[in-house]
Swiss-Prot record:
F(1)F(0) ATP synthase produces ATP from ADP in the presence of a proton or sodium gradient. F-type ATPases consist of two structural domains, F(1) containing the extramembraneous catalytic core and F(0) containing the membrane proton channel, linked together by a central stalk and a peripheral stalk. During catalysis, ATP synthesis in the catalytic domain of F(1) is coupled via a rotary mechanism of the central stalk subunits to proton translocation. InterPro entries: ATP_synth_OSCP/delta_N_sf (IPR026015), ATPase_OSCP/dsu (IPR000711). NCBIfam families: ATP_synt_delta (TIGR01145), PRK05758.2-1 (NF004401). Keywords: ATP synthesis, Cell membrane, CF(1), Hydrogen ion transport, Ion transport, Membrane, Transport. This is ATP synthase subunit delta. The keyword Manganese does not apply.
Length: 178
């Protein structure tokens, strides 16, 4: 993304996040935008909206389909983008808003990489440890099964990693033996 595009994204995302936080609607807005993000990822809608061959009317029509959200703030954001002809920036703005809300609230999705799936009890026991060690709040847990870890688990959130896997421990031993 070039500087001009980034400035446009910031122009819409920063004030929107500020309003969301002032109205204490960060959970609802985050949930709505996460659902929209999922739809965009499944359908490659961002490519459609940024395609030069698609008319503004078509882009507006597609974005208006998302105005059925429960959140008035999200509906208003979509309306402002349509009125200003910025439909092609909706997806980058959405991503930036999600990042800013996470950063401001310090609530993140945590990804747990493990050989086997964790039980609900194990997840419940891990949440306080994760929150304390990583100094953040857990919004949700995403599991990723990875047989290459051999045993243990690795946790990632907000660009931080806790790795207790046997694979990492074996690498550490290998490095010491060199």
């Amino acid at each position: 993304m070039d500087k001009r595009s980034y400035a446009t994204v910031e122009k819409y995302a920063a004030p929107f996040v500020q309003i969301v936080l002032e109205k204490n609607q960060q959970r609802d807005v985050f949930r709505e935008l996460s659902q929209i993000k999922g739809i965009f990822e499944e359908t490659y809608l961002a490519d459609f909206l940024s395609h030069i061959g698609v008319s503004q009317a078509e882009k507006s029509k597609v974005l208006r389909l998302f105005q059925t959200c429960d959140s008035v703030l999200v509906n208003n954001l979509i309306e402002v983008l349509i009125k200003n002809g910025r439909e092609d920036f909706f997806y980058p703005i959405l991503l930036d808003i999600l990042k800013k809300i996470e950063k401001e609230t310090n609530e993140f999705e945590v990804t747990i990489h493990s050989v086997e799936g964790l039980s609900e009890e194990q997840k419940a026991r891990l949440i306080p440890v994760i929150e304390k060690k990583m100094n953040l709040k857990v919004r949700s847990i995403k599991e990723n099964l990875d047989r290459s870890l051999i045993g243990g688990f690795a946790i990632t959130a907000n660009h931080k990693i806790i790795d207790t896997s046997i694979k990492r421990q074996l690498k550490a031993v290998k490095e010491k033996l060199k």
